[in-house]
Amino acid sequence: MAAKKSPIIELFRKFYYQIRNHPRVYVHITNRRYKIKESLFPKDPLISEIINSLRQNGIAQVDVSNLFGPKKLDSLTNWVREKESELEIDKKKSFFLNYGIFCPPFRADLNSNPFVQFYLEKKFLQIATAYLGYIPLLHTVEIRKTIPVGDAKPSASQKWHRDPEEKRILKIFLYLSDVDLGSGPFTYIVGSNPTSKGPWSRRFPQKLPHGVYPDANLVEKFTQPGDLLEATAPMGTIIFCDTAGLHRGGYATKNERIMATGFYTSFKYSEPPPGFTAKKVKGQVSKLDEVREIVSGN
């Protein structure tokens, strides 16, 4: 969440971000160096289906084996098992235990970390680039275990919220354990992504560059059957989501949840990873190998 400034600065920032985040300005001016033609990507029916679902609903789900084959999950779950003794409590959200949080540049991790390799897969980069409209930065890779909190009240990201800064944000979640209602499933209001055309796209809008945490009772007041997607699903489920839409998750009451997250954003994101300086891209990028290098921050 972007840090708040003085009232005068906040007023200026509001005006600035209204212009900056207009869809045409954001893609064609702010991120013009990073534009890439979607037509350059190979045609894949499943990838097209995911992109279309993101555009219409803000969310899509698929089993990891459908995208990457039956063996992809093995290396990821093996890594998690090896790190089980090294878990650390998250400094900001005490209901999380961290297996690892990784930021670019990923030079040291590319050959040794299966999750960094996973989130730099070409199919993910095709989806992220096509949905966002420009070559994104893989901002963060997180692997976390959610601790059951019993009857404690939801806090932080367990509450309904929209992420800050962008009108389009892509996060790709991977369930590394079976997730039921007691495990704190990722929950999304379908069609609440700001660039969709449904009524939820305009309810409880972001206060750019900040997000928003609307009152749960007000959200429930407007919720109709079919609006809510509670992503209860087996291990190996991938969730693609525009988290500028209304969502919550991690409110585990009975069972642990293990989940990886890849966060794709603009190189112009106002809160870059620690110590990162965006690489300047000259001209049109047309090869996915080059896209992969750029997205990794190397």
Please give the residue ranges for each predicted region.
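Non-heme Fe(II)/2-oxoglutarate
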Residues: A2-K14, Q18, V25-I29, I36, ...
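Non-heme Fe(II)-dependent double-stranded beta-helix
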Residues: K5-Q158
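Double-stranded beta-helix
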Residues: Y34, G182-G245
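Active-site region of the double-stranded beta-helix
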Residues: Y134, R162-E165, L176-P185, G191-N193
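A short secondary-structure junction signal
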Residues: H139-T140, K153-Q158, L170-K171, G182-I189, ...
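Short edge-strand/loop segments of extracellular domains
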Residues: I147-P148, I189-S196, Y264-Y269
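Histidine-centered catalytic micro-motifs
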Residues: S157-P164, L246-G249
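Short, conserved beta-strand element in jelly-roll/cupin
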Residues: E165-L181, T232-A233, F240, F263-S266
